[in-house]
C-alpha cells in the first residue's frame, strides 16, 4: 500500500515542539498525571501496575465505561485501540478494498481520505456548506449532494462529527437522514466522534451509534478529555464487526499500553469524566471570546462560530496562499497554524484555541502582525460571523 504524505501531521510533527506558540493543536491544554491520578488509591494502583501485555482488546472495566456513553451499548460493542487514529485505521483496513466507492465528508481530518486512497478505493468528496439562511451562520450538510453520491456501489460514508476543522456539529435530524440515505443502499457509516464532549454550549453532540445497524463510531481521549499522551482510543461496532476488527488490530499494535489502560479507566469513571469535560468546556468558553474579538477587529477575516472543539476555520481575504501564510507566521514569529491547503481549502487557516489563556493572546497578536503586512482588499460586511 502506497500512502500519500499526511501533510498536516508532518507539519505538526516537525514544528509543534519547536515553535513558541502552537495554534495548530486541535485539543485543549493537556492534563498532568498528578492531576488525573489525584487520589492515593489511584497512585498506588498506578505504581503497582505490572508492565506486561494487557488484554489486547482493552480491560473489561474500560469496555464497560466506554459502552456507557452510547445508547444500548455493551462491552461486546467495544474495541480499545491506540488512539482514535488506530480505530480509524483498522476500520478502513477492514471495510475498504481496491475499487470500493467511499464517501468522505469534507473538510475533514485527512487520515481517512489518505488511507482510503492508499487502499485504492474510489474516494468521493461530500462537502459541508457555509449557510446563513436561518440568520445563524453554520456549516451544514448538503443532503441532496449525499443522495446523489450514494449508490449500490458505495461501501462506506465517513463523517467527522463534531467536525475538524470547522467545529461544526450535525443535528440528530441530519444524522437520521444520513442513516436513511445509507440504508437504501446498505452502505456503512463510520463516524469519527473524537470531539464529542467538547461543546461550547455544554450540550453533548448526538452520536451516530444506535441509529442504524451498519454503524462504526470511533473516538478517543485526545481531544475532549485533554489526554492525547495516553494514546487511548476506541471504536463502537456490532459484536461480529468488533471480532473482525480485533483480527486487524492483531496486525497493527496488538494491545494498548498497560499504563495508559490504567489511567484511561481512571479518566472514564463517571465523576472524573464529568470533571474532565467540564474543564475542557471551561477552557473553550474562556478562550473563544478572545479569538472572536480578534477576528472581529480585522475586516479581512471572517468565520463561522465553532460549536465544538478548540478549533475554528478562519477565512481571509489577503492575497497570499495559505501555506505561504503559515510559513511566514511560523518563520517570522514562531507561531504555528494549519493552512487551509491541508483541507483543500486555500483562503482559510485553522486556528486552535485550546492552549493556556496566557499564551493565546500574544500568539494571536503575532499572527495579526504578519497579516497586517500583507495586502488585503477592502472587504464589505461579511455574511459570516465577525
Give residue spans per PLM region.
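N-terminal small-domain helix-loop-helix segment of the aminotransferase-like
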Residues: 1-83, 90, 270, 373-374
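PLP-dependent aspartate aminotransferase-fold enzymes
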Residues: 92-138
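Phosphate-binding glycine-rich loop
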Residues: 60-101, 105-108, 220, 319, ...
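PLP-dependent enzyme catalytic core of the Aspartate aminotransferase-like
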Residues: 72, 103, 147-148, 319, ...
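Active-site phosphate-binding strand-loop segment of PLP-dependent enzymes
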Residues: 129-203
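Helix C-cap/helix->beta junction micro-motif
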Residues: 119, 184-185, 298, 333, ...
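Conserved core segment of the aminotransferase class I/II
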Residues: 211-285, 292-293, 365, 376
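Conserved glycine-rich beta-strand-loop-beta hairpin in the small C-terminal domain of fold type I
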Residues: 265, 281-291, 303-316
Amino acid at each position: 500500500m502506497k500512502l500519500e504524505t499526511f501533510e498536516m501531521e508532518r507539519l505538526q510533527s516537525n514544528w509543534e515542539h519547536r515553535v513558541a506558540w502552537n495554534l495548530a493543536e486541535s485539543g485543549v491544554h493537556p492534563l498532568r498525571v498528578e492531576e488525573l491520578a489525584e487520589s492515593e488509591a489511584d497512585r498506588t494502583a498506578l505504581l503497582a501496575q505490572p508492565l506486561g501485555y494487557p488484554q489486547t482488546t482493552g480491560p473489561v472495566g474500560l469496555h464497560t465505561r466506554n459502552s456507557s456513553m452510547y445508547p444500548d451499548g455493551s462491552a461486546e460493542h467495544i474495541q480499545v485501540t491506540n488512539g482514535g487514529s488506530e480505530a480509524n485505521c483498522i476500520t478502513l483496513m477492514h471495510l475498504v478494498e481496491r475499487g470500493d466507492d467511499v464517501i468522505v465528508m469534507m473538510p475533514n481530518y485527512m487520515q481517512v481520505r489518505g488511507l482510503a486512497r492508499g487502499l485504492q478505493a474510489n474516494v468521493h468528496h461530500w462537502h459541508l456548506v457555509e449557510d446563513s439562511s436561518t440568520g445563524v451562520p453554520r456549516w451544514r450538510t448538503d443532503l441532496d449532494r449525499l443522495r446523489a453520491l450514494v449508490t449500490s456501489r458505495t461501501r462506506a460514508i465517513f463523517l467527522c462529527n463534531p467536525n475538524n476543522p470547522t467545529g461544526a456539529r450535525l443535528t440528530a435530524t441530519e444524522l437520521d437522514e444520513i442513516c436513511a440515505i445509507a440504508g437504501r443502499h446498505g452502505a456503512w457509516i463510520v463516524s469519527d466522534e473524537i470531539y464529542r464532549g467538547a461543546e461550547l454550549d455544554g450540550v453533548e453532540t448526538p452520536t451516530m451509534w444506535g441509529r442504524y445497524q451498519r454503524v462504526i463510531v470511533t473516538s478517543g481521549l485526545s481531544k475532549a478529555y485533554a489526554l492525547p499522551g495516553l494514546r487511548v482510543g476506541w471504536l463502537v461496532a456490532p459484536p461480529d464487526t468488533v471480532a473482525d476488527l480485533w483480527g486487524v488490530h492483531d496486525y497493527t499494535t496488538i494491545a494498548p499500553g498497560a499504563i495508559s489502560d490504567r489511567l484511561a479507566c481512571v479518566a472514564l469513571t463517571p465523576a472524573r469524566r464529568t470533571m474532565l469535560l467540564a474543564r475542557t468546556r471551561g477552557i473553550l468558553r474562556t478562550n473563544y471570546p478572545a479569538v472572536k474579538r480578534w477576528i472581529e477587529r480585522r475586516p479581512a477575516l471572517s468565520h463561522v462560530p465553532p460549536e465544538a472543539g478548540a478549533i475554528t476555520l478562519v477565512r481571509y481575504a489577503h492575497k497570499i496562499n495559505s501555506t505561504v501564510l503559515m510559513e511566514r507566521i511560523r518563520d517570522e514569529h514562531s507561531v504555528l497554524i494549519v493552512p487551509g491547503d491541508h483541507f483543500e481549502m486555500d483562503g482559510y487557516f485553522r486556528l486552535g484555541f485550546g492552549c493556556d489563556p496566557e499564551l493565546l493572546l500574544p500568539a494571536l497578536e503575532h499572527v495579526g502582525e504578519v497579516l497586517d503586512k500583507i495586502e488585503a482588499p477592502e472587504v464589505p460586511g461579511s455574511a459570516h460571523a465577525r
